[in-house]
């Protein structure tokens, strides 16, 4: 699932997390998807499993790339905000509001960076399940 066309709101971490949750739907439902679309041995002749696995592979690749872009884009945006706040803080050491805002943005940045680790786990799980069911029907290209 691609990111919404209106762009991604990186300012509110809760919205960022909700977007990722929606974008991870394909990964959350992969077992169900494979069970309903890739035939068992007894039904192998009725459905083109290689085409089904290829389509699922392409969907997973697109979803993973899209989420990776969203996460890295938000990390870059938030890093820039943190950098600017640090520079302002150096000029105004007595400004407690500025310090509070800097801490808030630093925390948000750490949470966003931790989403990269979550993403790695989600992707690994999806590829494991995909390979268990599709390895005999579809071989992904070597360069990906």
Curated annotation (Swiss-Prot):
Alphabetized Pfam families for the sequence: MIX23 (PF09774)
Gene Ontology CC terms, in alphabetical order: mitochondrial intermembrane space; mitochondrion
Modified residues (N6-acetyllysine): 100
N-acetylalanine PTM positions: 2
Source superkingdom: Eukaryota
Record key words, sorted: Acetylation, Coiled coil
InterPro entries: MIX23
Higher taxonomy: Eukaryota, Metazoa, Chordata, Craniata, Vertebrata
Sequence similarity: Belongs to the MIX23 family.
Keyword Zinc: no
Protein name per its UniProtKB record: Protein MIX23
Coiled-coil ranges per UniProt: 82-120
């Amino acid at each position: 699932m691609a990111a919404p066309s209106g762009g991604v709101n990186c300012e509110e971490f809760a919205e960022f997390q909700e977007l990722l949750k929606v974008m991870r739907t394909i990964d959350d439902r992969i077992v169900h998807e494979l069970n309903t679309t890739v035939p068992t041995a007894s039904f192998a002749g009725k459905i083109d499993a290689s085409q089904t696995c290829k389509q699922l592979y392409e969907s997973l690749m697109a979803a993973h790339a899209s989420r990776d872009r969203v996460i890295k884009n938000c990390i870059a945006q938030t890093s820039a905000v943190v950098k600017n706040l640090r520079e302002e803080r150096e000029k105004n050491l007595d400004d407690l509001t500025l310090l509070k805002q800097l801490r808030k943005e630093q925390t948000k940045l750490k949470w966003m960076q931790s989403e990269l680790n979550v993403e790695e786990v989600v992707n690994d799980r999806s590829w494991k399940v995909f390979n268990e069911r599709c390895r005999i029907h579809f071989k992904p290209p070597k360069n990906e």
